[in-house]
Amino acid sequence: MELVAGCYEQILFGFAARPGEPWTVTPDFTHHAHTASLSAVAVNSKYVVTGSRDESIQIYDMRKKVEHGALLQHNGTITCLEFYGTAHLLSGAEDGLICIWNTKRWECLKSIKAHKGHVTSLSIHPSGKLALSVGTDKTLRTWNLVEGRSAFIKNLKQNAHIIKWSPDGEKYVTVITNKVDIYKLDTASITGTITIEKRISSIRFITDSVLAIAGDDEIIRFYSCDSQKCLCEFKARENRIKDIYSFEREGQHVIVTASSDGYIKVWNLDLNKINNVPSLLCEVSTKARLTCLAVWLDQASEMKENCGKAATSTEANESEKPSAVKKKKVCGMNKSGKLTKQRRRIVPAKRKLEAPLQKKKKKKQNSSE
């Protein structure tokens, strides 16, 4: 298990977390990942990908602990990244594009002009057939991923900056400043609203009906999507929480938080006692201004992500081809808005992710020298 976090200082941190009594966290690598601050991170069973204000997406092979390459399709800050299974990645950026990537060959299958403004967030339905996105054009858009086209557009009163499907795919939520609107899939109508005092920075479904919410303060809150009531709240850190991640391990529900003062904390949540404050399992300080967080889970260790998605049969039939190549045909939008084939460089890289340097103590010189 690897805790991976990005920061304003352009660094990707990796910490090896080992469950036990107690849990332990040890530094694994610190990697100068980008030439600007990191803005997004996503994981699947093999890769970690990071997005940045430098407009690139960096790929890391976590099994080999090496850089795998860079995707240079977008012309704007990467705002959101999400894997579907082992075969596809979706990326969104401030250029208004959503790109669909084949992760076997790392080629762009389709590049869609999704929003007139920035793409602020996207989320893939557990079936892999639909995706939702929100942007700075005050729209919520539904995408048919089978055909790669827009299926539905809903106008919003304000710009939403987060959208998320529930694990069962029966509902989804949008976040507008400090408000969470809960939608039902079959009616596409709002069934409830949750409002907190400060701007919401991150949300995560713990179960199909329990939502973890982090605002621009130090508090994590658990809300029921059915009653919109707060089930529990606890102080995770002295500074504001930037991101939340959750997963399930051998029946144990684990929450990981990253705060702006550089702390990553791992918590144990008892779903049978959801009103109780989660217990702290371990913590580590990066001494950096963290921006994004994920947990890479090696499937060989019999762990499964809380909101994990099974690969489809079409993904299983994907042919294995070399993934790190110097050039690939990728898709782009021309000035008329039509889909075009372009040749963009996918930069291959095999540098190892380096372990943090240990400071050596200087030996005192003898006064006679």
UniProtKB/Swiss-Prot annotation:
Intervals holding WD repeats: 33-70, 73-111, 114-153, 195-233, 236-278
Gene Ontology MF terms in the entry: protein kinase inhibitor activity
Keywords: Nucleus, Repeat, Ribosome biogenesis, Signal transduction inhibitor, WD repeat
PANTHER family: P21-ACTIVATED PROTEIN KINASE-INTERACTING PROTEIN 1, PAK1 INTERACTING PROTEIN 1
Name of the protein described by the UniProt record: p21-activated protein kinase-interacting protein 1-like
Main location: nucleus
Function according to Swiss-Prot or TrEMBL: Negatively regulates the PAK1 kinase. PAK1 is a member of the PAK kinase family, which has been shown to play a positive role in the regulation of signaling pathways involving MAPK8 and RELA. PAK1 exists as an inactive homodimer, which is activated by binding of small GTPases such as CDC42 to an N-terminal regulatory domain. PAK1IP1 also binds to the N-terminus of PAK1, and inhibits the specific activation of PAK1 by CDC42. May be involved in ribosomal large subunit assembly.
Region (Disordered): 311-369
One Pfam family this sequence matches: WD40
GO biological process, one term: maturation of LSU-rRNA from tricistronic rRNA transcript (SSU-rRNA, 5.8S rRNA, LSU-rRNA)
Biological classification of the source: Eukaryota, Metazoa, Chordata, Craniata, Vertebrata
GO cellular-component term (any): nucleolus
Subcellular compartments: Nucleus, Nucleolus
Regions of compositional bias (Basic residues) in chain numbering: 338-350, 358-369
Source species of the chain: Gallus gallus (Chicken)
